[in-house]
Amino acid sequence: MRRTFAGLAGVPDIGLSPEEISALSESRSPAPWAVRARALCWARRPDASARRAIEAVVPEPVRANATPELVVGALIHYESTPVGPYDEITAVVVHRRAGTLFATVPFMAVDSPAGLVAGRENWALPKTPAEFEDLGRPHGEQELSGTVHDMNRAVAGPGWRIEVETTTGRIPLPAYVPPVLPLLQLGPGGEPFIFRPSAHGRGRRARLSVRVDAPPALRDWFPAGRRTGVLLTDLHIRLPAPTRSTGEAGRAARRR
């Protein structure tokens, strides 16, 4: 991996070690990407304490004059990507600035070195390595038609662990995410990387229990607890190449 992408802004103390950096090769899978996945998503509105924690992990040029409105957690199994299948967990913060919404990613962890490098070099996403463990069916739960257990996972890295357990409804409905909400990341030189993902698939209502054992820099704002969310299957995601110009989102990122 190009060393300029090793120090991207993200959660302190949950990053890449010098040994990990030296072992990573440069990405050979440039954007855009078209991928197929299965994803479990949930959200919460941050309280005052969580907003203070978000302020500590989102770079000032991104959060200037903006208010965190929503934190979205996602546990994703990528079934098909340019670098092969892999797993990912992430937390996305949706901000509002002057009536406009945008999102940014302070935390993302994967079990694929190639996926890690591509995420950093293509979109300036602060991906870090993690191990994923299948938790199976919750203890004592009856087998029910339509209940999905293969997204019950524990995800861990040095000094942190997140556990997600879920049950889902039985009726899938069409789901579509249009390429409207911009994601704004800062590149290694502070330049804005701006892109608008889109997705379509099928979704089912999910009930989740999310437990976080991590340093305060992650624990205090990650959407933990009992949540209602959605399980997305047969999910087709498009990740376009970012723009790096001073367009609308870039100008907004620089406002003071």
What feature does the model see in each segment?
Residues S25, A34, T67-L70, Y78, ...:
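Alpha-helical protein-protein interaction elements
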Residues R51-R52, V58-E69, H95-L101, H139-E141, ...:
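Generic structural signal for short, solvent-exposed loop/turn connectors between secondary structure elements
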Residues M1-E88, G225-R227, L232-D234, P240-R256:
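N-terminal domain-onset segments
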Residues R2, A6-L16, E20-A23, G119-R256:
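Interaction-surface and assembly-scaffold signal
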